């Protein structure tokens, strides 16, 4: 088996995690108490979904997941929610005090006390696997727990499981919408370790997803639940080929191989199509070509950056539902002819496609329509650098005055760590600039202005 362990850290990680596991259960017909009426091989078996769920002798299916937070309220919602019987109580780890939006608290003072317990639980899950493939790590980098404890856990996972791949689903701060004043600090400090310790990181950003909900689903005031359900569709599409037997399966390691040209350049954009409400879906049938085109629309991107400002290096298209390879090839050929979608000249093919015949499921009473086919795109584009440069500018404004720095130093950090992390990100911006302009004959002189 090729098992994956999911690790959900901090409020964002846990709430996205809830949406994901709810969707996985629906897709596999697993009830909230973990029973699965449709399962033929009770108590074991090598069904494809066993990559994400382990089975007990009593026929109960338990997610291979750990939820960690430094304060109890969010995890208590899982402990009392609809799916409380799904998880083993040991998998829900909560501390007593908050990281208070402070990276240093999450990474040094408070995170340090809980991290061994987490690694213990992860070790138990790993021992329960026959062929652990890697980790999916969910967190946000704006807060204290997701950024601080998230980085700490990633660093420790690198030590304990060096060769296993780590995929991150990371919520980055939005350009306009901010949830805390010190977001830029936490993000820069956290990205510093994401650079080193994740193999692929998918960037998500609340504002971009708000806009998609508002525009495509006609939700006037989207809640986090709306956002998370959309994100869970993306993550479900990515992991579908691990959980179902498909036509063109895509492994976790394949994402890495196909999307990451250089180790540091591993921050991905994601998009999902079709995002339509039930009343709209009633009137339109979406072909493979149409959903492929809309996945490439700049407005479909789940992070606020415009792919037209950069070039694509590689791109992974995961189709699910009623899709045949012939349609996919035609759709991809059309995309290649478009002038607005530019690939770097050193990567001429750039497309990796996966097809899974399991049609997308939707949460009952949710906002998304039930459709026959859907596509999820993960792309490596140089335009991602816009996300970083935005944060860096805000970081510099605050750090030039050393505003709020004493909170971090008081928790045992050194000022040198700020400048080290900031230099690392400056180097990353430079890396992206170079990748975008390699082998250029100088016919595009405006390449430098975008960054």
UniProtKB/Swiss-Prot annotation:
Q: Where are the transmembrane segments?
A: none
Q: What class of enzyme is it?
A: hydrolase
* Annotated Mg(2+) binding sites: 71
The site annotation (Involved in polymerization) covers 451
**Which InterPro entries does the UniProt record give?**
Alpha_tubulin (IPR002452), Tub_FtsZ_C (IPR008280), Tubulin (IPR000217), Tubulin/FtsZ-like_C (IPR037103), Tubulin/FtsZ_2-layer-sand-dom (IPR018316), Tubulin/FtsZ_GTPase_sf (IPR036525), Tubulin_C (IPR023123), Tubulin_CS (IPR017975)
| Chemical reaction(s) catalysed | GTP + H2O = GDP + phosphate + H(+)
Enzyme active site: 254
Q: What is its main location?
A: cytoplasm
Which Enzyme Commission number(s) are listed?
3.6.5.-
* Intracellular or extracellular location(s): Cytoplasm, Cytoskeleton
The entry's function note states:
Tubulin is the major constituent of microtubules, a cylinder consisting of laterally associated linear protofilaments composed of alpha- and beta-tubulin heterodimers. Microtubules grow by the addition of GTP-tubulin dimers to the microtubule end, where a stabilizing cap forms. Below the cap, tubulin dimers are in GDP-bound state, owing to GTPase activity of alpha-tubulin.
User: Tell me, how does this one assemble?
Assistant: Dimer of alpha and beta chains. A typical microtubule is a hollow water-filled tube with an outer diameter of 25 nm and an inner diameter of 15 nM. Alpha-beta heterodimers associate head-to-tail to form protofilaments running lengthwise along the microtubule wall with the beta-tubulin subunit facing the microtubule plus end conferring a structural polarity. Microtubules usually have 13 protofilaments but different protofilament numbers can be found in some organisms and specialized cells.
- What name does this protein carry? Tubulin alpha-2 chain
Q: Which organism is it from?
A: Oryza sativa subsp. japonica
């Amino acid at each position: 088996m090729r098992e994956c362990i999911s690790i959900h850290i901090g409020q964002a990680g846990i709430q996205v995690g809830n949406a994901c596991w709810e969707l996985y259960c629906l897709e596999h017909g697993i009830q909230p108490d973990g029973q699965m009426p449709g399962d033929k091989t009770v108590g074991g078996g090598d069904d494809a979904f066993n990559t994400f769920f382990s089975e007990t002798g009593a026929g109960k299916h338990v997610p291979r997941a750990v939820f960690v937070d430094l304060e109890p309220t969010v995890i208590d919602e899982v402990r009392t929610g609809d799916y409380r019987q799904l998880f083993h109580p040991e998998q829900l780890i909560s501390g007593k005090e908050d990281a208070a939006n402070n990276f240093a608290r999450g990474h040094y003072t408070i995170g340090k006390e809980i991290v061994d317990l987490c690694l213990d639980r992860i070790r138990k899950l790993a021992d329960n696997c026959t062929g652990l493939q890697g980790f999916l790590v969910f967190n946000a980098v704006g807060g204290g727990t997701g950024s601080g404890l998230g980085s700490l856990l990633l660093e420790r996972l690198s030590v304990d499981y060096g060769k296993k791949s780590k995929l991150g689903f990371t919520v980055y701060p939005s350009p306009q919408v901010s949830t805390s004043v010190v977001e830029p600090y936490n993000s820069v400090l956290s990205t510093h370790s994401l650079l080193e310790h994740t193999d692929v990181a998918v960037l998500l950003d609340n504002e971009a997803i708000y806009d998609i909900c508002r525009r495509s689903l006609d939700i006037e005031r989207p809640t986090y639940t709306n956002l998370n359900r959309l994100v869970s569709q993306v993550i479900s599409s990515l992991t579908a080929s691990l959980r179902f037997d498909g036509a063109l399966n895509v492994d976790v390691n394949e994402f890495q191989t196909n999307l990451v040209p250089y180790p540091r350049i591993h921050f991905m954009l994601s998009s999902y199509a079709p995002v339509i409400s039930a009343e709209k879906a009633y009137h339109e049938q979406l072909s493979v070509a149409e959903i492929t085109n809309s996945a490439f629309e700049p407005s479909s991107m789940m992070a606020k950056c415009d792919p037209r400002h950069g070039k694509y290096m590689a791109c992974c298209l995961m189709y699910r539902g009623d899709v045949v390879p012939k349609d996919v090839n035609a759709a991809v050929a059309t995309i290649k002819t478009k002038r607005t979608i530019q690939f770097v000249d050193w990567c001429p093919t750039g497309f990796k496609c996966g097809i899974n015949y399991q049609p997308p499921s939707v949460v009952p009473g949710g906002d998304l329509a039930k459709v026959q086919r859907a596509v999820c795109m993960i792309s490596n584009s140089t335009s991602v650098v816009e996300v970083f440069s935005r944060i860096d500018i805000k970081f510099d404004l605050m750090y030039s005055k050393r505003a709020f720095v004493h909170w971090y130093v008081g928790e045992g950090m050194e000022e040198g760590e700020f400048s080290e992390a900031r230099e690392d990100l400056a180097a990353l911006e430079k890396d992206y600039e170079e990748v975008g302009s390699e082998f250029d004959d100088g016919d595009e002189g405006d390449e430098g202005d975008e960054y």
